[in-house]
Design a protein with these regions (language model features):
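Charged, cofactor-coupling segments
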Residues: 2-123
Length: 123
């Protein structure tokens, strides 16, 4: 059985030697991206997407890689305060939601499309 947290690759805010997940990312590796916030003793919220490592720019500093999203699920806008987003963050969210709608809606019936259209509305 596969798990999104299998070695050898992983991102953490600190190194955990026993996890053995500090490796060089290689093209084709799948990596979960799980931004979140946790309020101690209260609750936590996390949004998770799966990404695949792709080759990006190569220059005098070496080969750069980037993460391409491969799962497309709306971010719940009920949990987003647009007033605290920067222009860049708002643009990113709107573009991400447009990609979600464009990629997923062809597989949905009219009722499901209407739900997805609302869930991915621009802010």
């Amino acid at each position: 059985m596969l798990n999104v947290h299998e070695a050898p690759n992983g991102f953490r805010w600190r190194i955990v030697p026993e996890r053995n997940d500090s490796c060089v990312l290689e093209e084709g590796m799948v990596q979960s991206d799980e931004p979140g916030v946790y309020l101690e003793g209260e609750y936590g919220i996390r949004h998770e997407n799966e990404t695949v490592v792709r080759k990006g720019e190569k220059n005098e500093y070496g080969q750069f890689m980037y993460l391409e999203t491969i799962t497309f699920v709306p971010i719940d806008l009920d949990g987003v305060d647009p007033d605290v987003l920067t222009q860049y963050e708002r643009k990113w969210l709107n573009e991400y939601h447009q990609a979600v709608y464009d990629k997923v809606s062809p597989y949905l019936n009219d009722e499901e499309k209407a739900w997805l259209k609302h869930a991915t509305r621009a802010i």
